[in-house]
UniProtKB/Swiss-Prot annotation:
It comes from Onion yellows phytoplasma (strain OY-M). Its EC number is 7.4.2.8. One of its GO terms (cellular component) is plasma membrane. It holds the Pfam family SecA_DEAD. This is Protein translocase subunit SecA.
């Protein structure tokens, strides 16, 4: 293990050393670039693009391109990128993560690698965590830097219409959010008109801002385009009515994993309540699913921590556990959201089925090159390396960091902790020092707010109930007298700049009300203070009654803290490296557990990923092809040849002709397509291979059918193009219908496969095996349906507008206009299941 850690550390140092060599070359060109006129920058860009087309590599162009971008940044924004920002930019170009502390200028850093990679002619996507940041960079001076350099810049947000999205995706540089990128990908892969695709270029390079938030915190969040399904709402209400009758002895909660199950006594109670013999009988699978969701909703999901209730609009809102923001329009998956609605007595919305889905883990792995920036990635470097093949390189700060990080204050009870916290706030507020108070839940933020009001301390509160003015509140958090309470969000993407005279007061004071289960979130909170060499202060206040201590420490930590207080002769606050290490150990344990779980889920998701890429690849070929008639003909020929094989099993020179004709006319062809005597002659001729002869006969039937349909359209020149469009429409609609069913079948399989472990079988192997069977069956049904539909029925006037799809994130619906937008992705896999 020690050797492994040394190897990682040395590789990081080596990467930084190489980056310094390159950065020095960039710096050496500074004087040369300063001599350029403003009009020369676009000309230089054209020259660099030409050099790339003539064979120069991006690595060879890097020094000049970075120097040019650096000078352009200086002229447009008035800010000159620091040497350390050039280092960060080199790391980004190499497809790695630049860990840059708060205030070190990640925004300027991204300009250089984005510009360089756009010289290749392929698009560069700069991904932000919210639309505010994407719009800010696109509309502001950062976007102007690219325009000054002769690059086109686009913005991709929910409010953009279809034409605007298409135009944005054609730009050299695209500012976008992660969710909009993913939804455009899914929408494009449900499109039936090639002209409607919004993404017609390859996924070449992405720079992900706050990369840990998107690729770690939201890694498990599935992007889903979904449709409503018919589902009785009474089951949710009945299941909720049942769980309200339960006592502690009826269920078991595992605090570490937050899972809940009925005990034997609880199962018996359920069977009596619902008047059934066996709750786990397959016929009661739906009831069991509803009961489990009701249990989770009642005992593991907490209002104002996991979700909010908007009684005015009658809805349950998810709280993002990593940002503290409410997520309007989203739903918890698998019926859990409906269970919460039943619990809170608001209108129960329809449950949904999945039309298309992808996780951020798999979506961002579609890029040829991926890089990212954040101030807090080192604690997750194993995951970035294992899942995304990216190294985390710590970039030195421009000036030394002088923030004072004090040891945690520890307490036995919450009351003692809150009293000490208010005392600290009051003391610092009297000096007019700005204070940022970090909480982990909305509930705690409101408790602190009430206590501050009692002490007549004016403050701002920033949580899921009040985030509309987030940027404005955070921007003012560094002024004298400012007291700001922030829930898990401390305004990432917006710097807290110190007001006049604040440095003399010690800078911004950051006070954490408890440890988060992730060290990264704690580090993000600390990182709000001490930017760019400013003074700052941070300390956490923790108690044995904190959730983290309760889940993992139990009474043990309470006894330790009580003992320490006696030893230190303090009735309340004390500090201890041992207790701090204990909490850090818990955090590492949780982080490791979460990483293992994400890897575990990714293993399952990879099965669906392979299947999705096969389907989307074939679908894309059909959608954009100008030879769809040949593709369909090949598919039909292959399908029919396979279908008739059982009729020639015993003897390839003969078969039961009437049985064969009946089979083909029932399944694929119109009645009276085949002449009995002709088929008898083909199938029972001892001088020829009957199977080969009949397969050629079938091919002629297919060609004749397609030609007659084509002739029908070509009678009218205005309708000539409808034949190919009709073939595409039928083929794509059948693929989509079956694939959407398949996704839901795979989801059901995933939910139910856990039970096989009881039979001493590996659940993943079973999922893989059963998933392959489902996929193969789907492929066969698609091929059969396409063949039968085209051969049996006329499709001359079968064009119809496809239904609107609803967009879902975390299985959450969103009825806004963004559901109309589309986009595509070139999938690397080239497997073709039908031809």
């Amino acid at each position: 293990m020690l050797n492994f850690l040394k190897k990682i550390f040395n590789s990081s140092k080596k990467a930084l050393r190489k980056a310094r060599t390159i950065a020095n070359k960039v710096q050496n060109l500074e004087a040369q670039m300063a001599l350029l006129d403003d009009k020369d920058f676009a000309t230089k860009t054209a020259e660099l693009k030409k050099l790339f087309q003539e064979g120069k590599t991006l690595n060879q162009l890097l020094p000049e391109a970075y120097a040019l971008a650096k000078e352009a940044t200086k002229r447009v924004t008035g800010l000159t990128p620091y040497y350390v920002q050039i280092l960060g930019a080199v790391i980004l170009h190499q497809g790695n993560i630049s860990e840059m502390k708060t205030g070190e200028g990640k925004t300027l850093t991204a300009i250089m690698p984005a510009y360089l990679n756009a010289l290749s002619g392929n698009p560069v996507h700069i991904v932000t965590v919210n639309e505010y940041l994407a719009k800010r960079e696109f509309e502001g001076s950062i976007g102007d830097v690219f325009r000054f350099l002769g690059m086109t810049v686009g913005l991709n947000t929910k409010d953009k219409d279809h034409a605007q999205k298409q135009q944005a995706y054609l730009c050299d540089i695209l500012y976008t959010t992660n969710s909009e990128l993913g939804f455009d990908y899914l929408r494009d892969n449900m499109e039936i008109e090639a002209s409607n695709l919004v993404m017609k270029r390859p996924y070449s390079y992405a720079i992900v801002d706050e990369v840990d938030s998107i690729l770690i915190d939201e890694a498990r969040t599935p992007l889903i385009i979904s449709q409503s399904v018919k589902e009785t709402k009474n089951l949710y209400k009945e299941a909720q009515r049942f769980v309200r009758t339960l006592k502690n002895r009826h269920y078991l909660i595992e605090l570490e994993t937050k899972t809940i199950e009925l005990t034997e006594e609880g199962i018996t109670k359920a069977e009596n309540f619902f008047q059934i013999d066996n709750l786990y009988n397959v016929e009661h699978a739906s009831l069991l699913h509803h009961v489990k969701n009701a249990l989770k909703a009642a005992f593991t999901m907490h209002k104002d921590k996991d979700y909010l209730v908007d009684y005015k609009d009658g809805q349950v809102l998810i709280i993002d556990q990593f940002t503290g923001r409410a997520l309007p329009g989203r739903q918890f998956s698998d019926g859990l959201h409906q269970a919460l609605e039943a619990k809170e007595g608001v209108l129960i919305k329809e449950e949904t089925s999945i039309g298309a889905t992808i996780t951020y883990q798999n979506f961002f792995r579609l890029y040829h090159k991926l890089s990212g920036m954040t101030g807090t990635a080192k604690t997750e470097e194993d995951e970035f390396r294992d899942i995304y093949n990216m190294e985390v390189i710590e970039i030195p700060t421009n000036v030394p960091m002088i923030r004072i990080d004090e040891p945690d204050f520890i307490f036995v009870s919450l009351k003692e902790k809150y009293d000490a916290l208010i005392e600290e706030i009051t003391s610092r507020h009297k000096k007019r020092q700005p204070i940022l108070i970090g909480t982990t839940t909305v509930e705690v933020s409101e408790i602190i707010s009430k206590k501050l009001k009692k002490h007549s301390i004016k403050h701002e509160i920033l949580n899921a109930k009040n985030h509309s003015k987030e940027a404005d509140i955070i921007a003012k958090a560094g002024l004298k007298n400012a007291v700001t309470i922030a829930t898990n969000m401390a305004g990432r993407g917006t710097d807290i700049r110190l007001g006049e005279g604040v440095k003399e007061l010690g800078g911004l004071a950051v006070l954490g009300t408890e440890r988060h289960e992730s060290r990264r979130i704690d580090n993000q909170l600390r990182g709000r203070a001490g930017r760019q060499g400013d003074p700052g202060y941070s300390r956490f206040f923790i108690s044995s009654e904190d959730e983290l201590a309760q889940r993992f420490g139990g009474t043990r930590i309470e006894k330790i803290i009580s003992l320490l207080q006696k030893i230190s002769d303090s009735e309340t606050k004390t500090s201890s490296k041992m207790v701090t290490k204990f909490f850090t150990k818990i955090q590492k344990k949780v982080e490791s557990s979460n990483f293992d779980y994400r890897k575990y889920l990714l293993k399952y998701d990879d099965i669906l990923r392979i299947q999705r890429e096969i389907i989307y690849n074939q679908r894309k070929e059909i959608l954009v092809s100008n030879r769809v008639e040949q593709i369909v003909q090949d598919l039909m020929q292959k399908t029919l040849n396979k279908a008739i094989l059982p009729h020639f099993t015993n003897n390839p020179t003969q078969c039961q002709t009437q049985t064969l004709i009946t089979f083909l006319e029932n399944k694929f062809f119109p009645k009276q397509t085949f002449d009995l005597e002709e088929v008898q002659e083909l199938c029972n001729n001892p001088k020829t291979n009957s199977l080969d002869s009949f397969q050629q006969h079938l091919l002629q039937k297919v060609k004749x059918t397609l030609q007659s349909q084509k002739d029908f359209f070509e009678k009218d020149p205005d309708k000539a193009q409808y034949f190919a469009k009709g073939l595409k429409w039928i083929t794509l609609k059948i693929i989509d219908n079956y694939y959407q069913r398949h996704i839901n079948d795979m989801s059901s399989l995933r939910q139910g496969i856990g039970f096989v472990s009881y039979g001493q079988q590996d659940s993943f192997i079973e999922y893989q095996k059963e998933g392959q069977v489902l996929f193969n069956n789907m492929i066969a049904k698609i091929a059969n349906d396409i063949t039968a539909t085209i051969l049996k029925f006329s499709f001359a006037d079968s064009f119809x507008t496809p239904p609107k799809q609803k967009v879902f994130l975390n299985n959450d619906s969103s009825d806004d206009e963004s559901s109309k937008k589309r986009r595509t992705r070139k999938v690397r896999t080239s497997k073709k299941p039908w031809n």
